[in-house]
Amino acid sequence: MRKRARIIYNPTSGKELFKRTLPDVLIKLEKAGFETSAYATEKVGDATTEAARSLEQNYDVLIAAGGDGTLNEVINGIAEKPNRPSLGIIPMGTVNDFGRALHLPTDIMSAIDVIIEGHMTRVDIGKMNSRYFINLAAGGQLTQVSYETPSKLKSIVGPFAYYIKGFEMLPQMKAVDIRIEYDDEVFQGEALLFLLGLTNSMAGFEKLVPDAKLDDGYFTLIIVEKANLAELGHIMTLASRGEHTKHPKVHYKKAKSISVSSFTDMQLNVDGEYGGKLPGNFLNLKQHIEVFTPNDIKNEEIIEQ
């Protein structure tokens, strides 16, 4: 019996490469036994709406082609529903954090091959208040880097654009008095930022969570206490090597449930996009989504980053 697949794609991602390649993608999937149709997003929220509609129409497979923002929208369209379809991913963004974590190829046809081969892995996702995320949630000025970095700069220098913007923002950073409750522990004090990670790759930092596991039901919680400019620059340098976890101003914990509050405004970042402001309640949904992954990589290699 032929499987029904629905492609949801951002036509502007990757310099419109997927849009131009779509006819070949449809032919390849058709030959592999998939009855496939496609939907192009036009504005924020379209991918969420279409993903929910596709689920109601009983598609077996959803394929998200775009950056981490497109993938996040698709997840938000299906996360609350039963009988969720399997998820295929074609990484077309600047950084593609989740795709990196799953070792997915960035070549379009190679990514389609991963879906055709049919090897799947169940992964955790996070819930923040009423919305979902698949890679990270964070708070603090530095976490605004991903959505404040100019698109033109990202297109020119790729992921390095985030480093440039990050160092540019360092002098502006201010600590916020914050309360973070996680499982049976509490952090209360001044912090520059906090971050909840589901994978090892965030804004191009592939070693930010060096011991990330994608299916264990735990977030990695990183809290950076108030620090001076030199200390913060040092922490960022250490983070590029995965050595920040031992810095005295860095708290590195594992938790299933986290609650964050403050009397001061703090913006939130969810999968690289603006996520509102505190307070935030975060819950890890263990092995909630089934995604296609390369079959020449063992699950343990994906899960134990």
Swiss-Prot record:
Q: Copy out the cofactor comment.
A: Binds 1 Mg(2+) ion per subunit. This ion appears to have a structural role and is required for catalytic activity.
| Binding-site positions, Mg(2+) | 213, 216, 218
The biological process GO terms on file are: phospholipid biosynthetic process
Answer yes or no on keyword Lipid biosynthesis.
Answer: yes
Gene3D superfamilies, A to Z: 2.60.200.40, Probable inorganic polyphosphate/atp-NAD kinase, domain 1
PROSITE patterns in UniProt: DAGK
Keyword list, A-Z: ATP-binding, Kinase, Lipid biosynthesis, Lipid metabolism, Magnesium, Metal-binding, Nucleotide-binding, Phospholipid biosynthesis, Phospholipid metabolism, Transferase
A Gene Ontology molecular-function term? Answer: metal ion binding
Q: Which cofactor does it need?
A: Mg(2+)
Q: What does this protein do?
A: Catalyzes the phosphorylation of diacylglycerol (DAG) into phosphatidic acid. Is a key enzyme involved in the production of lipoteichoic acid by reintroducing DAG formed from the breakdown of membrane phospholipids into the phosphatidylglycerol biosynthetic pathway.
Supply the PANTHER family for this chain: LIPID KINASE YEGS, SPHINGOSINE KINASE
The protein's name: Diacylglycerol kinase
Q: Which organism is it from?
A: Staphylococcus saprophyticus subsp. saprophyticus (strain ATCC 15305 / DSM 20229 / NCIMB 8711 / NCTC 7292 / S-41)
